[in-house]
Curated annotation (Swiss-Prot):
Leader sequence segment: none
Gene responsible for this protein: fadI
Name by which UniProt lists this protein: 3-ketoacyl-CoA thiolase
Alphabetical UniProt keywords: Acyltransferase, Cytoplasm, Fatty acid metabolism, Lipid degradation, Lipid metabolism, Transferase
Recorded metabolic or biological pathway in which this protein acts: Lipid metabolism; fatty acid beta-oxidation
Lineage: superkingdom: Bacteria
């Protein structure tokens, strides 16, 4: 057993999460079509502050993330401060850790709280898959820079004459890993084959995710943590996530063709999370600051861990690697958890991580640990559904998971919850939460 690392300030204060909120999540090019991530971020932070009734000047720092960067607003955090009526002196900076971006934002605010430089801050993330930075070819970009330096019209025309029609075609954002050229779906296929995960198992998990998410909405469990979004042309508000298939059957999933390995694959659009637009944020404070303001925290951040592995194989095993570290730092075991919430990038990736968390061989030979992290109890796992159903606005997912888990822990009378995710680049994140 490694060292327990209590997340407390010098005065012994725990890190309290006092409030959390998100927009409804919308599939790419649907309800939030044309709404940039920065506007989604402003929307959720503005509403979060209004609902919490916390004076804006109490917030001393805002750390926010965006994975699909927009060149015109590179520091989304600062734009949110300036666009929501927050105190202009509020420190604000942006982070990016792929699909674990808002985990990183929460960790950064927590570290500021523990260092004593602030007493309250906001962490979160927003992404739009509908408003994308469409680029130009490398040759056109090179010519445009040279044209800007040219002094005469003849020099400019000569430069433009080097271009061909294909050089003028727009270039969409890459969906593959920069370092390997592999898509995340390719890695999900590799993991399905390596760990013997069948198409039927993947479809069953996806179906479970949609059923549970639909039930969560039907039972009213998400109303407190999801705002109503009013979007141009303001004819109809978006109230709920629009990706959830509440009436689907397992037979529906079986009809889809593989999306990555067309001949022999098992990963489909239905057993993967879709491209999504949305934003989410949480307010963190020292425990004493929350008491001063008369606030009852949703819960507390008990521990966190980030890991990184090679990107050529098993790139999406972040949960299997970061979870034992987070549990160790929290001084807990898997059996002591009340809830486990794992990001469902793909059903194949999710099932592989579940398998390896319970594997003694993986623990010994890969992690160098004496025993497996622990079997995942299905009754504790993704009890309200997961990212396959809700969708995945990259930078917002972590904050969604944290808020959702804390609310569910409180409904169950308290306890400990694990939230964990894989991320592009072979990254992994895990956090242990506590509610009373």
């Amino acid at each position: 057993m490694g060292q327990v690392l209590p997340l407390v300030t010098r005065q012994g204060d725990r890190i309290a999460i006092v409030s959390g909120l998100r927009t409804p999540f919308a599939r790419q090019a649907t309800a939030f079509h044309g709404i940039p991530a920065v506007d989604l971020g402003k929307m959720v932070v503005g509403e979060l502050l209004a609902r919490s009734e916390i004076p804006a000047e109490v917030i001393e720092q805002l750390v926010f993330g965006q994975v699909v960067q927009m060149p015109e607003a590179p520091n989304i955090a600062r734009e949110i401060v300036l666009g929501t009526g927050m105190n202009v002196h509020t420190d604000a900076y942006s982070v990016s850790r792929a699909c674990a971006t808002s985990f990183q934002a929460v960790a950064n605010v927590a570290e500021s709280l523990m260092a004593g430089t602030i007493r309250a801050g906001i962490a979160g993330g927003a992404d739009s898959s509908s408003v994308l930075p469409i680029g130009v070819s490398k040759k056109l970009a090179h010519v445009l820079v040279d044209v800007n330096k040219a002094r005469t019209m003849s020099q400019r025309l000569k430069l433009f004459s080097r271009l061909r029609l294909r050089d003028l075609m727009p270039v969409p954002p890459a969906v593959a890993e920069y370092s390997t050229g592999l898509r995340m779906g390719d890695t999900a296929e590799q993991m399905a084959k390596t760990y013997g995960i069948t198409r039927e198992q993947q479809d069953a998990l996806a179906h479970r995710s949609h059923q549970r998410a639909a039930q969560a909405w039907s039972d009213g469990k998400l109303k407190e943590e999801v705002m109503t979004a009013f979007i141009p042309p303001y004819k109809q508000p978006l109230v709920e996530d629009n990706n959830i298939r509440g009436n689907s059957s397992l037979a529906d999933y079986a009809k889809l063709r593989p999306a990555f390995d067309r001949k022999h694959g098992t990963v489909t659009a239905a057993n993967s999370t879709p491209l999504t637009d949305g934003a989410a944020a949480v307010i963190l404070m020292t425990e004493s600051r929350a008491k001063e303001l008369g606030l009852v925290p949703l819960g507390y951040l008990r521990s966190y861990a980030f890991t990184a592995i090679d990107v050529w194989q098993d790139m999406l095993l972040g949960p299997a690697r970061s979870t034992p570290l987070a549990l160790e730092r929290a001084g807990l075991t898997m059996s002591e958890l009340t809830l486990i919430d794992m990001h469902e990038a793909f059903a194949a990736q999710t099932l592989a991580n579940i398998q390896l968390l319970g594997s003694e061989r993986f623990a010994r030979e890969v992690l160098g640990r004496a025993h497996a992290t622990g079997e995942v109890d299905d009754s504790k796992f993704n009890v309200l559904g997961g990212s396959i159903a809700y969708g995945h606005p990259f930078a917002a997912t972590g904050a969604r998971m944290i808020t959702q888990t804390l609310h569910e822990l409180r409904r169950r009378g308290g306890g400990f919850g694990l939230v964990t995710a894989c991320a592009a680049g072979g990254l992994g994140a895990a956090m242990v939460l506590e509610a009373e």
